[in-house]
Amino acid sequence: MQSLYVEGNSRMHRLSPRAKLLSLTAFAILLFISHNLLLLSGAVLVAAVLYGTVGLPIGEALLRLRPIFLTIAVVALFNLIFNPWQAALVPVLRLTALMLLAASVTATTTITEFIDEVTALARPLERTGRVQADDIGLALGLVLRFVPEIVNRYQAIREAHKARGLKVRPTSLLAPLIILTLKDADNVAAAIDARRIRRHGS
């Protein structure tokens, strides 16, 4: 399975995972308490510049953003239908800035670093007896590993339909995608159980 991580030595790469995660959280909070279009536009510009420094070729960088652009387009459409354009622009700018920064963080942080950092941050929650930090880290790692794989599989199924001359419809692609994804999930669950990765205290 592919990772979203990009090898490099940019400033974003050199930042510690904790600094990046905390900065992303703070950035998100600031975005969602602000309604200033100028400030939000500036945040989009800053996030775009940071994303441009991760070391991806322009073509691949834009390709990675395609699902993000589709999400933003849907959000923009719904907001424009029900709100004046100024009000509709606020959530669009927020989402764009946040997704660009999140893309920068995932491109400059390995999955192992993510898991280790989230597990460490979640460790104090174990005192409640309701959560296991290792499980939280494992769940995040699996999500980060599976997202690009699911996107690639969707594209492969789509191309296979085109090659056979079949009409490409989201509904016709969804069933095989779900089946293959569930099979992968079963295989991963079996591997986790076989290796006794989940460690619960008695």
UniProtKB/Swiss-Prot annotation:
It holds the Pfam family CbiQ. Belongs to the CbiQ family. Its main location: membrane. One of its GO terms (cellular component) is plasma membrane. Involved in biotin uptake. This is Energy-coupling factor transporter transmembrane protein BioN. It is a multi-pass membrane protein. CDD domains: EcfT. Keywords: Cell inner membrane, Cell membrane, Membrane, Transmembrane, Transmembrane helix, Transport. The chain crosses the membrane at residues 21-40, 44-63, 68-90. Part of a biotin transporter complex composed of BioM, BioN and BioY. Induction: Expression is repressed by biotin. It is found in: Cell inner membrane.
